[in-house]
């Protein structure tokens, strides 16, 4: 079983994804069974009001190295906006970072969905984080 690393950009997102991983694993593997999970978090004030791209890129790189050192095979991040730096750091990461839009696209294809409604912050809506991944899968997205 793979060791999952969670880049905890927001406490809410990290807690939700951790809880869901454990719940889904229990359904598939049995009660109290889940993969090894490591979480790395920065205090939100470090990145909340800074130049997003440069600060986020540095934070994700640092987090990925710490998660790898903990034994993680790959990392995930439940914060939509942070994925804007994915292309900037992808090749420099010591472990794979699973893109949030790839997960959404995979799930949509599995359910034969052809269009999705994206709800989020203005930053996420305007960033185009989902556009390329969804278009490759021929899934259209509306924004609100």
PLM feature segments, named:
Residues 1-144:
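Non-catalytic structural scaffold of enzyme domains
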């Amino acid at each position: 079983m793979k060791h999952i690393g969670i880049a905890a950009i927001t406490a809410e997102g990290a807690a939700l994804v951790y809880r869901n991983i454990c719940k889904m694993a229990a359904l598939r593997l049995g009660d109290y069974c889940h993969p090894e999970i490591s979480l790395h978090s920065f205090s939100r004030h470090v990145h909340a009001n800074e130049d997003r791209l440069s600060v986020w890129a540095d934070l994700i790189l640092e987090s990925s190295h710490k998660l790898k050192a903990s034994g993680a095979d790959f990392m995930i991040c439940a914060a939509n906006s942070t994925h804007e730096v994915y292309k900037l750091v992808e090749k420099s990461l010591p472990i794979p970072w699973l893109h949030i839009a790839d997960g959404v696209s995979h799930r949509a294809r599995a359910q034969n969905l052809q269009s999705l409604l994206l709800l989020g912050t203005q930053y996420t809506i305007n960033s185009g984080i989902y556009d390329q991944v969804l278009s490759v899968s021929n899934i259209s997205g509306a924004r609100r």
